[in-house]
Amino acid sequence: MEGQAPSDRVSDRFGKADSDISFRSCDGILFKVHCANLKVCSEGLSPPEGTTTEAEVVSLTEDGATLELLFQHMYPQRQPDLRKFEFKQLADLAEAAEKYQVYTAMEICHARMEEAYPQHPFEVMMYAMKHGYADLMDKSELKALEVSPTTAFESFKPEVYIAWTRYYAQWLDLLASFHNMTTTIFVHSPHSHNNNHSIWLMCVCGSLIRPAALLKLHSICDAATRACNSEVCFYCKRSVDDWRDGELKQGMERMKKLSNFL
């Protein structure tokens, strides 16, 4: 804690003379609020019992716009309509609400983030995974395949990371099945390749490095066809198409939802 700086500007909404604790945003705005409200509405912002806070200022990492919204959810008043704000502002508020466990804000942010999924699927997926919202995790589980194992380890809670790795492993098995199929094409259908035939197969296999690529297999094959001037090996193309319409489709149908691993 520290004292008020000369350059600090006091929030117009949160500048009451009877406040008993002050917070400073990262952009130098002071919010003078009441400990009683913090104790009721938040587990992460209320000071310990018996501490004196009137003359102290607590610096937070959030900006003034985010704290302005966050503190409004700690007072008995009509709450701001979050549908009128840009997505980044909503996402910043959602993170702050989770960080400081402001329950009233957490619930409304969850609802608004779900509504934002069609326009911001990856960001909503990361929010759901970081904070363990099972309904949004299932809704965005295919997007979760785009997360690298390193990012997942660094970003997710331990129980969510374990669930993600088990879900991801199902897709790794499918990816291994695909590459095993491509190595046996010549065994099941002996034939020869010209240069363009080889280019097509190399382009397809080279593009399927991570599980997320399996969802784009059709467009990957189309891109490979263009790369080899539409000269495609009939046997290889049929094998890939059969695997996609058979093994891949069946594997996805019997796959467990991400939330099943929580």
Please provide the spans of the model-predicted regions.
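A short alpha-helix capping/helix-loop junction motif
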Residues: 85-86, 103-110
